[in-house]
Regions:
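Surface-exposed, interaction-prone regions used to assemble/regulate multi-protein complexes
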Residues: 1-125
Length: 125
């Protein structure tokens, strides 16, 4: 994990219920899919994938947590059949994570990783 120290924050995203913490300068990568000839894309150097409980805390207050992926942003606006794993919906039909992570990503723009270690409990700090 020492390799990410000094890396600029790029963005937050998710793949179903997995947090993607995207760090580092953009690099060009070739992807074989979705077309047979593939395509080139600019992507962050690293994407750390977390499928465990996590949270972002600022001034002692949790501003985004793993449970936000499973909670509707506007619970009174969605029906009983609401599903957390659908993306691309209007904000009132999206998860708390999908709505709040974009603002957190904007606020973290320009930040860099100053330290990274695993605690005795396995937390990334």
């Amino acid at each position: 994990m020492e390799r990410v120290v000094g890396a600029p924050f790029h963005s937050l995203s998710r793949a179903v219920d997995m947090l993607c913490l995207n760090l580092g300068a953009e690099v060009e990568r070739h992807f074989e899919l979705p077309k047979p000839e593939g395509r080139d894309r600019r992507v962050p150097s690293w994407s750390i994938h977390l499928q465990t409980p996590w949270r972002f805390v600022h001034s002692g207050r949790t501003v985004l947590a793993s449970g936000d992926m499973y909670a509707p942003f506007a619970p009174d606006q969605v029906g009983e059949g609401w599903e957390y794993d659908l993306v691309g919906r209007p904000a009132v039909e999206s998860s708390r994570f999908d709505v709040l992570s974009t603002g957190l990503s904007r606020r973290m723009a320009g930040c860099t990783v100053t330290a990274c270690r695993a605690s005795p409990l396995g937390d990334l700090e």
